[in-house]
Amino acid sequence: MAELTIPADLKPRDGRFGSGPSKVRPEQLQALAAAGDLFGTSHRQAPVKNLVGRVRDGIKQLFSVPEGYDVILGNGGSTAFWDAAAFGLIDKRSLHLTYGEFSAKFASAVAKNPFVGDPIVVKADPGSAPEPQSDPSVDVIAWAHNETSTGVAVPVQRPADSGDALIVIDATSGAGGLPVDIAQADAYYFAPQKNFAGDGGLWLAVVSPAALARIEAIGQSGRWVPDFLSLPIAVENSLKNQTYNTPAIGTLVLLADQLDWLNGNGGLDWAVKRTADSSQRLYSWAEASSYATPFVTDPALRSQVVGTIDFADDVDAAAVAKVLRANGIVDTEPYRKLGRNQLRVAMFAAVDPEDVSALTRCVDWVVERL
């Protein structure tokens, strides 16, 4: 099967459809080469601090960050931020919506933390999602804007009667590709390797005045927190355009260039229209197909940035992905733990909608010949 050769005129111009790490634009790599003078220099000095400032300013512009909100960052990616939030944003107890691997992982991290109460977990099966909701016993309400493992997107909207509870949104794969009103969240956190077309290892968060006050209060409470996961330390350094420990300069350069590209093309509105175009092409193809169907049955929950497409039992999705990979069309395999006969397609802002259409034509071509 792997010897099938897809005609060149059918193939996408860029065959990268991974859900993270994701496609990096060639211009970003040129920016990386042009930034050579920054490599091997101190992250406490002006050149690198200016780069961090450029990233923070770019995020503020992209998300039209309200007055009083700020952008903080640290090393370790969203995985590290789960623990940082458990230590530094939850006062007593949290509520988590879980509907896939990554939304469940934050809840699991909180459950293991000895300084906070057992979380309330509202669970839905993969492919669906619970309605955002509140509980009077919690001071943090958390869910994922986009569940990367399943292709389910849940809008960011404060639940009724949420009171003073902080709304903490995992936007790892949603930020920069899905619509959002940042004022509806208190901590909107993400990483660069999805819509921002960069490398991993960094977390960033847009935080509200209420979140900043909570961070300060917990920081002064005497709760033990490892310095690496300390949000007060992250805030202190971020306001100086620094990270607590040495960042990867290349990651920051790629991120800064992608932010410039997004903002230069029209900002979040432009990016959302682009991902909507890509996803409409993918889902329309699947709905018209004789062998493929969108895994997420409710169109309102279907993600614009990560599409999961189930195949009929008589079509081996793994075999299709293998042929695609052999032809330079890569990372369409499903999330490993989901265990479904499907393809998963990233449609982040850097992905050309025309390439999504080309991908669907290639899948049809391969399936006809298997």
From Swiss-Prot:
- Provide the residue span(s) of the region labelled Disordered: 1-22
InterPro entries from the UniProt entry: Aminotrans_V_dom, Pser_aminoTfrase, Pser_aminoTfrase_mycobac, PyrdxlP-dep_Trfase, PyrdxlP-dep_Trfase_major, PyrdxlP-dep_Trfase_small
Enzyme Commission (EC) number: 2.6.1.52
Catalytic reactions on record: O-phospho-L-serine + 2-oxoglutarate = 3-phosphooxypyruvate + L-glutamate; 4-(phosphooxy)-L-threonine + 2-oxoglutarate = (R)-3-hydroxy-2-oxo-4-phosphooxybutanoate + L-glutamate
List locations, semicolon-separated.
Answer: Cytoplasm
Pathway assignment: Amino-acid biosynthesis; L-serine biosynthesis; L-serine from 3-phospho-D-glycerate: step 2/3; Cofactor biosynthesis; pyridoxine 5'-phosphate biosynthesis; pyridoxine 5'-phosphate from D-erythrose 4-phosphate: step 3/5
Name one process (GO BP) from the record.
glycine biosynthetic process, by transamination of glyoxylate
CC cofactor note: Binds 1 pyridoxal phosphate per subunit.
Cytoplasm is among the record's keywords? yes
For this protein, what is any one GO molecular function term? pyridoxal phosphate binding
Residues annotated as carrying N6-(pyridoxal phosphate)lysine in the record are 194
Which cysteines share a disulfide bond? none
Any idea which positions bind pyridoxal 5'-phosphate?
Answer: 102, 148, 170, 193, 245-246
The residues that hold L-glutamate are: 44
Q: Name one Pfam family in it.
A: Aminotran_5
- Gene Ontology terms: cellular component: cytoplasm
Q: Which cofactor does it need?
A: pyridoxal 5'-phosphate
The UniProt family comment states:
Belongs to the class-V pyridoxal-phosphate-dependent aminotransferase family. SerC subfamily.
Q: What does this protein do?
A: Catalyzes the reversible conversion of 3-phosphohydroxypyruvate to phosphoserine and of 3-hydroxy-2-oxo-4-phosphonooxybutanoate to phosphohydroxythreonine.
Report quaternary structure and partners. Answer: Homodimer.
- The name on file for this protein is Putative phosphoserine aminotransferase
Please report the organism this UniProt entry assigns to the protein.
Mycobacterium sp. (strain KMS)
